[in-house]
Every structure is written in structure tokens, then in C-alpha cells.
């Protein structure tokens, strides 16, 4: 799913959402009450951690969004773990908890074996066609490996929303996605046609070209974001979080619309601007 991971846990008497980097996320924590009854779940299960994905066009981190979330954000749970251990709650028990507490989840496709490859390929092709990221295969026997399979379209979208700041990412990020897209092509006996090549080229070059053009003209490379929060005080906390994470974010506007504070901000992508400017100005660089 095209979003960002969070881990939700009760610490003393409060429930927090943590990002993959182990930071408390003020935005995600603010919005938890909109996703499920966190009070009831954690009062009855204080030792558990709910793992999931927050996705949608109005999030503060990710410009990519699944096609079925067209505004704001939604939460999709995929795991439950036990605090202070490596233990993952078994799948059937996990699903029972999701259903009991009405916690929204990622799509569940059911049980499959190696004899179901044809049916799985059909699912994967549909996901690719519908603009979805892919499938995660989770073992019923915990010691076995978990496997993630992504679609070619997901690889192109990943590159398309990041190539404008390519210099801020490790080269492996793009290399892995190009390889995955080609693996997808071969596994599904699809042709390396003009459509595929056009998507690959545009996802890599078009956003980067726009960044080069801006930097060459002395214009800062930026990303624009919109988010909604329940409490005004959490707007300040969100920007303190950005500062802590060394994200150069500037508030553009905030206004109360209905029950939410609608916030717009801009992230200045100075590292990308600086590198491109230096190259454009004639500084030497080494391959």
C-alpha cells in the first residue's frame, strides 16, 4: 500500500503513533481517534501494538497515494504485536481482534498454497491494473519468511514521486525498482513495449527535469502538502517534529473548516537544489 507505516501503542495512560524511525508522529497521533476506538482497544489490550499504514493525499510525508483514497487519509491495519517482545500475534487471532474492535485493515485475500500460482497471478495483474502496490504473503507458521510482491506500476509511481529529489535517495532505491519492474514484466510474459518504456522513462526523467530547470533558474525545489488535524496545538507539535527530523518545512496557511484544522505547508528540498546548482555552475563531480 502506498502510504507510511505506523506503530500504535499505549504508553502509560496515552496512546501514540510511532513512525518507522521510532519518532512519535504528532499528525498520526492526532488522527488516531478517527480510525478506530483506540480507548476501548488499548484499555482491554494494553500489552499490544497495532501496526498499519496511513495512506491518502493529505498526509505530511508521502506524495504517493492509493487510488481508493481520494481525500484526507485512512488507516489500514496489517499486524498486531506484543510490546517488549518480538512476538507477532498469529494471523487468525489477529483477524479476530481486527473484527472485534472494528479496526480497518488492508484487503485480505485468504489462504493460498504453491498450487494457487495462477490465481495469485490474476490478483497481481488486477492490482497492477488498478494502481495498487502489490501483495504481502504472510506465513501461517510464524518461523517461515514473509514475502512482499510489488507491481510494475508501483515501481514507476515510487520513482515518479521521488526522482525530483533523486540526489537525496540512495542509488539502490531506484535500481531496485527498475529491476522489480523488469522482473514483473518477465514473470507475466509481458512485452518490453513503448508503453512500458515511456512509463519508466517519464517516471525517472520528467520530475528530475523539472527540478533541474528550477535549480538552474535559481528557484528553490519544493514539495507542497495539505493535512487535516483535530487539535490546533498539534500543528505546532508537527512542525517541532519536522525540525527534530531536520525537515525544512514552512507553514503556508491554517484554517478551521468544520471539525478539522486544514493546514498547508511547503518542504524546501535544499539538498537537491544545492547539488544540482553546483553541477549546473560547473563544479566537477566524479562517477
Where are these regions (language model features)?
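Core nucleotide-handling region used for phosphoryl-transfer chemistry
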Residues: 1-5, 9-287
